[in-house]
């Protein structure tokens, strides 16, 4: 099946790997890992709507995450064998959704800090607003109309990268964030307001590993704990740093992804 998204390809043999990027980035996030593993796997990394070489979503701020998910499923459906899913943050969220939708097509998952806000809210038995207000008292991230404003972007960047990060960014560093601000805001709203309860992820029977940092936001580390407690047989690996480790500290992150793939090739992974 075809997809309107740009899909980056590396390698041509072995078990396919579909790698899903974080908000604000593109499929090229996975280039170094893909080049390292392309002798053993065919690797496909799409640019989601609004990023890289892919078109914008026709729905603007009314974007739904299912638009990206449908394209991921189309990519998976076009493969002639089961694939391994890799993901970071929003990409990890989509990977979990794809594995639930196509269990027969997904062999294993290795994800860096996938975000499951609905699962966190259901586990804590509270409205999502109660979760968000801890770090965003004005609930700016739930207001898509603020997309692209300095107050929204500062709240978003500082949450994921640490207090003061937005102020320290140069104009050149801010430019791609500002360019993708509408899609980022639409994604954030979609993911944060997703109501999928945590127990749904117990349906995943594939080998699952969750990678995480040491200084990531508390909510994200709680999500990791919830997933590993919910998904039978899942494992974790800890890497010094925070949520943006795949960009800021890629060598150990990619080493963990590569090790997971090697263990799969060696038959060392079991559900």
Which sequence ranges carry the predicted segments?
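Conserved serine/cysteine hydrolase catalytic core
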Residues: 173-229
């Amino acid at each position: 099946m075809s997809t309107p998204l740009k899909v980056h390809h590396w390698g041509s043999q072995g078990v396919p790997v579909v790698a899903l990027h974080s908000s604000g980035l593109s499929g090229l996030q996975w280039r170094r890992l893909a080049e390292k593993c392309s002798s053993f796997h065919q690797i496909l990394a799409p640019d989601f709507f609004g990023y890289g070489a892919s078109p914008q979503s026709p729905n603007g701020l009314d974007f739904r995450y299912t638009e990206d998910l449908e394209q991921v499923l189309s990519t998976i459906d076009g493969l002639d064998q089961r694939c391994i899913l890799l993901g970071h943050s929003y990409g990890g969220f989509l990977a979990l959704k794809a594995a639930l939708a196509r269990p027969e097509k997904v062999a294993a998952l290795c994800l860096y800090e996938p975000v499951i806000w609905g699962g966190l809210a259901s586990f804590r038995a509270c409205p999502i607003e109660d979760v968000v207000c801890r770090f965003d008292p004005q609930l700016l991230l739930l207001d898509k109309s603020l997309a692209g404003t300095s107050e929204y972007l500062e709240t978003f960047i500082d949450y994921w990268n640490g207090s003061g990060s937005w102020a320290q960014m140069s104009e050149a560093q801010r430019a791609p964030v500002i360019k993708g601000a509408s899609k980022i805001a639409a994604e954030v709203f979609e993911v944060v307001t997703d109501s999928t309860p945590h127990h749904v992820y117990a349906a995943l029977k594939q080998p699952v590993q969750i990678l995480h940092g040491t200084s990531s936001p508390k909510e994200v580390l709680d999500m990791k704990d919830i997933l590993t407690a919910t998904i039978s047989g899942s494992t974790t690996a800890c890497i010094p740093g925070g949520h943006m480790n795949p960009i800021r500290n890629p060598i150990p992150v990619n080493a963990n992804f590569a090790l997971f793939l090697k263990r799969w090739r060696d038959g060392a992974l079991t559900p």
